Regions:
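Conserved short alpha-helical segments that host acidic/polar catalytic motifs at enzyme active sites
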Residues: 2-158
Length: 158
């Protein structure tokens, strides 16, 4: 969010892994972080089989909570994000988390060369569903993971 005297855009990010219901904890955390962005919000919780279940919405965290309640999400590990739009309009498709084949990602910041990266990744066969720079990061890390077979090396290489 932009501060009263300008400043830089910010977002709220939360992660959880433990024994309790991750969705409830993520939503509670996002409510506390909502001042950092209220254009859109989203969560991804990994169910008992490891499958990611993602819920996104435009607007405030309470909208997300209502949407998530309809899905009856159950899992003990997940990530959440509340967004102040920097790349892409405040629309559901631009809400985080973003996914690429092997990973799900939230991000706070601006990727200056995302236009060039997007063209490169599209040439490599990646399809984009959002207008965000974060989706570029997700696809780039995925591409490097496929090349290097190490998540840590892939992140550093990206």
């Amino acid at each position: 969010m932009l501060g009263e005297k300008g400043g830089t855009p910010v977002c709220g990010i939360i992660g959880y892994t433990g024994e309790n219901n991750a969705e409830e904890i993520l939503l509670q955390g996002l409510r506390a972080l909502e001042y950092r962005g209220y254009d859109s919000a989203g969560t991804t919780v990994f169910d008992k089989s490891g499958k990611p279940v993602t819920v996104k919405c435009r607007g405030r965290v309470e909208n997300l909570a209502q949407k998530a309640a309809k899905k009856e999400i159950s899992g003990t590990c997940g990530i959440g994000h509340t967004r102040w739009a920097t790349h892409g309009a405040p629309e559901e498709k631009n809400a985080h988390p973003h996914a690429s084949r092997s990973l799900t990602l939230v991000h706070n910041g601006i990727i200056d060369n995302c236009v060039e990266l997007k063209k490169e990744l599209e040439n490599d066969g990646y399809e984009f569903v959002s207008d965000t720079d974060t989706e570029c990061a997700a696809h780039l890390i995925d591409r490097e993971y496929r090349r290097l077979s190490s998540p840590v090396k892939a992140i550093y290489s990206a």
